[in-house]
Amino acid sequence: MQFVYDPLPYRVIFGAGSVRRVADELSHVGSRALVLSTPEQAGSAQELAATLGDKAVGLFSKAVMHVPVATVDAAAAVARELDADCTVAIGGGSTVGLAKALSLRLDLPSLVVPTTYAGSEVTPIWGLTEDGIKTTGRDKKVLPKVVVYDPDLTLSLPAEMSIASGLNAIAHAMEGLYAFDGNPIVSLMAEESIRALARSLPLIKADPTDAKARGDALYGCWLAGSVLGAASVALHHKLCHTLGGTFDMPHAQTHTAVLPHAIAYNAPSVPEAMERASRALGGGDPATKLYELAVGLGAEMSLAKLGMPKDGIAKAAALAVANPYPNPRPITEEGIVQLLSRAVEGLPPITA
């Protein structure tokens, strides 16, 4: 056995009511915090700022999707004016992305309080958008110093959004099982993530106020984000990035529809990873079980219904083959055409 494990340096506080610990945990980060949120969560941000007392020097509630450079400019100006020495971000991917951008630009450390299942708070991946062009990169300095997970803050997350985000997280974990730069710790986190999410998402669909299921789902998404931050992705993510960029398809829903087919494609080359996935999903063929899980949760499995033109299959396959991510099974145009043809129609995956 040979591997490299380079753990990411962040502190995690997890549990119902943990948001009450933010003021104490801020001592690990700084003493003059600029609190960040989207306009929609400004009220929650104000409440959080109030609990911080004089440790909160101001509020910036203009975070938006895709982290526009203009928004970062505005937030950086406020941070400088208030002499902030850190940020506290409450919300989902948009707010976390802004906190990361400020860490990158101003070296401001952050504390993050996630209220969605995005998982980006535990990855060193950052992104910025300017003039319609998105630039991404990896840098450990954008990682929050502290992440406070309070499942109670996710109780109001709509079930449909929870399911889409949760299935998206399963995709991160599944590919972590066979990442070329994976290791035993990543595999353990990935398997546990899949198990927690497969168990909790049906319960959330049945009762979105189920506090235990919400805790399980948030736990699973933390693990999935940790996997994404520690290991590379493969065919599944390449296909989803290609479809999203080429046909402007919805991110999480595209992941859900493609995943069973990508797993079926790679399964013959990664038997040990499939054993782990099967165990996490309660037995059986992982690709089939993932398809059945998604259908049972009411997810749309047809790429055509999500916006992909049927005449776009050949183009997508050519793009995927032209610049592939490292993958355990060789990627062929013929194989991808077959895979996408079934995903476009929403059919079950072809398994061995």
UniProtKB/Swiss-Prot annotation:
Positions with a binding annotation for NAD(+): 93-94, 115-119
Known pathway: Xenobiotic degradation; gamma-hexachlorocyclohexane degradation
Keywords: NAD, Oxidoreductase
Positions of disulphide bridges: none
Record note on cofactor: The maleylacetate reductase family of enzymes does not require any metal ion for activity, despite being related to the family III metal-dependent polyol dehydrogenases.
InterPro entries: ADH_Fe/GldA, ADH_Fe_C, Alcohol_dehydrogenase_Fe, MAR
Free-text disruption phenotype from the record: Cells lacking this gene lose the ability to grow on gamma-HCH; growth is restored when a plasmid containing the linF gene is introduced.
Enzyme Commission number(s) of this protein: 1.3.1.-
Domain of life, source organism: Bacteria
Catalytic activity: 3-oxoadipate + NAD(+) = maleylacetate + NADH + H(+)
Family: Belongs to the iron-containing alcohol dehydrogenase family.
Entry function: Catalyzes the NADH-dependent reduction of maleylacetate to beta-ketoadipate, a step in the degradation of gamma-hexachlorocyclohexane (gamma-HCH or lindane). Has an essential role in this assimilation pathway that allows S.japonicum UT26 to grow on gamma-HCH as the sole source of carbon and energy.
Name of the protein described by the UniProt record: Maleylacetate reductase
Native source organism of the sequence: Sphingobium indicum (strain DSM 16413 / CCM 7287 / MTCC 6362 / UT26 / NBRC 101211 / UT26S)
